[in-house]
Amino acid sequence: MRRRRRFAGNAVFITGASSGIGAALAREFAREGGDVVLVARRQDRLEALAAEITQAGRRALVVPCDVTRDGDLERAAALTRTAFGKLDVVVANAGFGVVGALETLSLDDYRRQFETNVFGVLRTVYATLEDLKKTRGRLVLLGSVSGHVGVPGSSPYSMSKFAVHGLAASLAPELAAHGIAVTLISPGFVESEIRQVDNRGVWRREAPARPIPGLLVMPTSTAARQIVRAVAHRRREAVITGFGKAVVFLQRHAPGLLATVVRRFAVKGRREPR
């Protein structure tokens, strides 16, 4: 018996779709029957991904876009309406991480982090909200375990993800009145290129050596399957990876123990070159 595809005929809009979780989600939503809108800055990556998805039998629209630029996401949403006639799922995934001790960072570093990770999410929501109201669709916000637990040496990133978590908690009941399900995704360590993006948001070919044991890092394809399942079930939040779930559990039930673990891990984590 053929398995029913959970997003058959849906139009799925994904920011940050050129690599990592975003690209894996595009593949997984397409596997589940969706047509995908690939939104990111790197057009060559998007074109290659679109060709892969089209070859597998689904439609893919490429929209080069910078979530920090006013107007880009409105243009992307308009192109989606023209191509697919509707919008069923929106995934606000674009983001990067600013790292460093407080004394080594400036207010501009924090502003840059928020411009992508927070205001980029808001721009995505504003650009697509009316479309989601029409389809009673799904809004997916990419948070992080770092939105539950602050990590020394990553205060801009943690602050931005705490903000996304607050936005999701506020919007979930607010948008439920319009039939829109809001799902917050809180990943732990997932394989991605985030470590190849510097504090200015510029991608570099070589990433710093990873201080994280490989066993704690989930493949993007596995993470994407778990995320799509959570979106299909209209869950309020999904914490991804066993490590991430353990961290959130300890934060709620043994915060003192977790603080000790985080301090030890953060010291090791900050020894890497930048």
Describe these PLM feature segments.
Residues 18-19:
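Conserved glycine-rich cofactor-binding loop
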Residues 125, 160:
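Active-site helix of classical SDR
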Residues 144:
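Residue(s) in the substrate-gating loop at a strand-loop-helix junction
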Residues 101-102, 106-111:
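Substrate-binding pocket helix/loop in short-chain dehydrogenase/reductase
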Residues 64-75, 107:
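The beta1-alpha1 cofactor-binding region of Rossmann-like NAD(H)/NADP(H)-dependent oxidoreductases
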Residues 177-242:
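SDR active-site lid
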Residues 32-49:
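Conserved glycine-rich Rossmann-like NAD(P)H-binding loop of the short-chain dehydrogenase/reductase
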